[in-house]
């Protein structure tokens, strides 16, 4: 996942949950400016921060990183 897509997802998750950047930064144990850089794509959260973010939003790391692949079960394949 690109920094830009992760940044957008972090922004969306925070806003949907009505959290402030200050609050999320506090949960992560970083200053607000660092968290702001995550949302703008200037920095990438480390592994520990990603786990904390997934826990905060009650989603898996795969969902956070958009690694989950939707499978279309209606597609048939000829052998």
Q: What do the predicted segments below correspond to?
A:
Residues 15, 29, 40-42, 69:
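Residue-level detection of the helix-turn-helix DNA-binding "recognition helix"
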Residues 65-79:
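Short, charged recognition helix plus adjacent turn
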Residues 15, 26, 55:
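Alpha-helical residues within the helix-turn-helix
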Residues 29, 48-63:
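DNA major-groove recognition helix of helix-turn-helix/homeodomain DNA-binding modules
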Residues 1-16:
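A short, Lys/Arg-rich alpha-helix, primarily the initiator
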Residues 9, 20, 46-49, 60:
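Residues that mark the N-terminal boundary/hinge immediately upstream of a DNA-recognition element
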Residues 18-37:
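Short alpha-helical DNA-recognition segment
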